[in-house]
Structures are given as C-alpha cells and as structure tokens.
Amino acid sequence: MKSFYHYLMKYRHPKPQDAISQFANQAYEDHGFPKTSSDYHELSSYLELSADYLETMATFDEAWEKYETEVHHA
C-alpha cells in the first residue's frame, strides 16, 4: 500500500493554488515527516506536535479523506 506521504507528493506544486498543495510542499521540506506511515493517528499526532506549518488540521483531514478514497478503496 502507498504511504500517505507518497500519495501526498502528487499534490506538490511550485505555485500551490490550494491548502493541500501547500501542505504537500511543506511536508516535502519536513525531514522528520513519517514518510512510510499509513496510520492516521501516527500522522495526526506528528502534525499536531511537531509540524508548525499546518495552519489547520482540517487540511490534513481533507487530504486523508482523499487518500482513503483513492488508495484504500481503489
């Protein structure tokens, strides 16, 4: 199964137009991001405790929903 990070990288963009693209760009620059994880709670905890670049967890939740739909139910 594709990790959340690997999935998120498809949203990277040099000129991000939305919050998920900004999140993807920032996660790419975050060397501590749990790149192999597919666990919601692990990722959520990391972002809440260690990532100061995410303005709202709603962005993560939206990206997670897309990940769940496209990867887990594909």
UniProtKB/Swiss-Prot annotation:
Stored InterPro entries: UPF0346, YozE_SAM-like, YozE_SAM-like_sf
Pfam families xref list: YozE_SAM_like (PF06855)
Taxonomic superkingdom: Bacteria
Protein family: Belongs to the UPF0346 family.
Protein name per Swiss-Prot or TrEMBL: UPF0346 protein RBAM_019500
Organism name: Bacillus velezensis (strain DSM 23117 / BGSC 10A6 / LMG 26770 / FZB42)
